[in-house]
Amino acid sequence: MADRWNAGVIPYAEMGYWQPDYEPKDTDILCAFRITPQDGVPPEEAGAAVAGESSTATWTVVWTDRLTTFEHYQAKCYKVDPVPNTPGQWIAYIAYDIDLFEEASIANLTSSIIGNVFGFKPLKALRLEDMRIPTHYVKTFQGPAHGIVMEREHLGKFGRPILGATTKPKLGLSARNYGRVVYEALRGGLDFTKDDENINSQPFMRWRDRFLFCMEAVNRAQAATGEIKGHYLNVTAGTMEEMYERANFAAELGSVIVMIDLTIGYTAIQSMAKWARDNNVILHLHRAGHGTYTRQKNHGVSFRVISKWMRLAGVDHIHAGTVVGKLEGDPMTTAGFYDTLRKDSIKADLSKGLYFDQEWASMPGVMPVASGGIHAGQMHQLIHYLGEDVILQFGGGTIGHPMGIAAGAEANRVALEAMIKARNEGVDYYKEGPEILKKAASRNRALDTALATWGDITFNYESTDTPDVVATPTNA
């Protein structure tokens, strides 16, 4: 073994970044990386390289390490396990001392953990599968601007999922016609409607016009139904100043909720979360762009990690998968996402892709959003897989209804209430779901038409991101 202080290049494992006897501290930030080393690179060296390059190391020995307590600041790869049934891949467990990170900064956390290692030549591929964020670090963050409980109290809606829809077509409508869609959907029975991720302020519909017509629709629908309604006004823009201007205008109009896209960046998300809490406005996050780095199983960042970062950052909603819809969503993996967002205390469960216990230290939960290819005929499956604290967004499943938008909203509301009633009466609603829907449809033409239109539509493709311990393709 080379002397740690010999000039030149020394293997990372021999510089202290591989420590199989290390016992992680309660205050350490722990990471589970899926590593695919280049041929001839031992997994221990690959894990040590990730630890080194994401903490204190560079490619050669530097004498200035002696000016620090380098053993304290070095990340330590303390375990490397082979991935079951996947030759050439390992899970490397790495511990980082809490002193390596600035308090309450997702930008600093991510710059360290994922900032410089994903293009590292000794690795063919690298994926951050999970993190354990210690209570000591969790408590430095604001967390969700409101959280699940406060949102329900704000809206006065309890005991069932929240219903929503994305306005379609998402591009091309004038502001007036856009507002008409919002009104019909809310009047028909939905709780929320929303802008989609790429509606900002385009030539066909400027943001101020959209906000005015949407809030007119919200107010009229509230007056007609006696229920609190909302429309996710997307305030995403090119600068923080412009986002604040749009958000402030939304608040002045009385909107209960605004929306941002994941693409605005972590610091902007935290800034908007602070604004949302200060202004008593719910904050919805669309996970636009996440699939570019979360979907592939061997390289990138798992969405369960993004879920943890966004809970810390302070959003109230985030899209988290449907299981039965058109987008990627293995049942067990999706359950892990939902647990991460909603639960106060989470136990490691490899069947859900959860590598660590996680304590949230009373930080409020984030309301998951299920959207993309779902319809009223799947209501029993959605409640079974996703539970009660979820927002179910039926965009095409509302606006594509043959009888019109209001009828589409009515069909979804009737299906939901029939399923919740059956659940509350002790009926096995998952097993009896089709019969429950059929019975409800016999008394409601809108639901009957929805079932006739979409009843046989499914998206049963095998998921790319499944837990390694069990083979669980999407199966609805």
UniProtKB/Swiss-Prot annotation:
Induction: Transcription is 27-fold up-regulated by growth on H(2)/bicarbonate compared to pyruvate, RuBisCO activity is induced by growth on H(2), H(2)/bicarbonate, formate, methanol and CO. The basic functional RuBisCO is composed of a large chain homodimer in a 'head-to-tail' conformation. In form I RuBisCO this homodimer is arranged in a barrel-like tetramer with the small subunits forming a tetrameric 'cap' on each end of the 'barrel'. Keywords: Calvin cycle, Carbon dioxide fixation, Lyase, Magnesium, Metal-binding, Monooxygenase, Oxidoreductase. This is Ribulose bisphosphate carboxylase large chain. The modification N6-carboxylysine is found at K194. It comes from Pseudonocardia dioxanivorans (strain ATCC 55486 / DSM 44775 / JCM 13855 / CB1190). The record marks K326 as: Transition state stabilizer. RuBisCO catalyzes two reactions: the carboxylation of D-ribulose 1,5-bisphosphate, the primary event in carbon dioxide fixation, as well as the oxidative fragmentation of the pentose substrate. Both reactions occur simultaneously and in competition at the same active site. Mg(2+) binds at K194, D196, E197. The keyword Transport does not apply. Its cofactor is Mg(2+). The lineage of its organism: Bacteria, Bacillati, Actinomycetota, Actinomycetes, Pseudonocardiales. CDD domains: RuBisCO_large_I. Substrate binds at N116, T166, K170, R287, H319, S371. The active site is at K168 (proton acceptor), H286 (proton acceptor).
